[in-house]
């Protein structure tokens, strides 16, 4: 794939406001940053860039539409043939973009490979603001854990969701003046989209009845790429389908679908694979499910929020560790 490194047609408005570059690359980043992006556009001269890390329509563009963000000004098309090439492309494309548009600051969120755009910003002496900083699961085998450590250390301002995260940052030796506990933006995002979530007709479209199906989402490397975990997880899913005798709707990422097909693993006939859904439809499925089984990082926040407004659902986190210990408190 020919990556894009010429951004001569991209520029800030130069309206006297501070110039802020926001870089995203995956669905969780788009969701969590959606309310923040809207506020930033009011106070800063903003450019929103997408690395292309999730290149499927249902993994990015549908969320820009659902969350009323408009499409990004920049698509980097940075996905390579393998992990090393993708990471290199993200840093290279980010570097080229920053040298051509000269932002006053970079805003990133989380622990994805797209966050490694911070490496380019650091070399160019561009201040880095990192949301969701300080998360740790203490499992060095997870690629996200490496990204977290790198980005936390090189960021100029780390915005943590919790006291747990703040303490982890302090353990890394980061000074207090570079760390702020801001809380998570997810409650604001969900609250502002609640009407659309509740009015979704996705159950009718799929022929499902409230509390008569299980919703499944499994996409992390630890569950999909590790053979032992993969077999264990989907064997358990088949047993779940047999025990409860109800449909299991699997919101299946393209990479996960390919892995299942290549493995030859036979899913129970009650497990229904479906392409990833939009933000409103997926959350409507969550609040109406008999149970939600997921390895998504947003599950603890979503289940907590919906419980607080009488839309509770049993949430089962299929992780060997979590970077959000506050969800277990």
What are these regions (language model features)?
Residues 2-9, 53-58, 77, 154-228:
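A nucleotide-sugar donor-handling region in carbohydrate enzymes
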Residues 2-53:
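N-terminal subdomain of nucleotide-sugar transferases
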Residues 15-16, 97-104, 208-209, 288:
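Glycine-rich phosphate-binding loop signature in dinucleotide/nucleotide-binding domains
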Residues 19-24, 29-36, 43, 63, ...:
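Active-site and donor-binding regions of nucleotide-sugar-utilizing enzymes
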Residues 22, 48-50, 108, 130, ...:
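Structural beta-sheet core signal
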Residues 53, 61, 197-288:
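Donor-nucleotide binding loops and adjacent catalytic segments primarily
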Residues 54-70:
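N-terminal beta-loop-helix "entrance" segment that forms/cooperates
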Residues 108-109, 115-118, 130-131, 158, ...:
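A donor-sugar binding/catalytic signature common to diverse glycosyltransferases
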